[in-house]
Amino acid sequence: LCNAAVTVADSPMRVATGPLVGAWTERPEDKAGRRLDMSVLEGLDKARFSVPQWYPDYEGMYWADGNVLDVNGGGFQGIENVRVIMKAMRRVYPLAVARIADRRFNSTPASIAQNKTYFMRPLREMSRSVTILGQTFPGEIYPPEDGDITVSWPTRTSVELYMAVRPYNCPKKITCNLFLDLNNYAA
């Protein structure tokens, strides 16, 4: 993530960042000297190992998805979702600590509304696009909407915040379908 064109919302498999460098530039071989093929890597990837990958007729070695040990079907199976949530939490946490025992945060409807706006600020910042050298990079998440934050008072002196963070969809598999149309449009 030292590249300004990459954000925490990007998958490690992002090809636009460039190919791997160093020891990962060569396709691995097993002890018998056979080059590692994608079928082995796909099996390791399904078992949640981090593996390199390449694309036919496309130069370079790249990294496969950043797998984590979430349950099957869970929202945190890709590292980019974990990083987005962690970044949001790192930005919200100091705001929450600053409100401890602060009477500006109380159980009145006006205070709850004001503090929903206050705690949504980091999410609004993460949703903004940025333009670098004429290229626009989307925000890391969708802009927050009404209802994306809930304030709950389980006791008189304790508050719980629930916040929804929605990352943008991003393709990890692209299928191209081409159809040949031989109609005679000149007739």
Where are these regions (language model features)?
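Extracellular Cys-Trp
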Residues: L1-T17
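Structured, hydrophobic secondary-structure cores that serve as assembly/anchoring elements
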Residues: P12-V15, P19, A23-A187
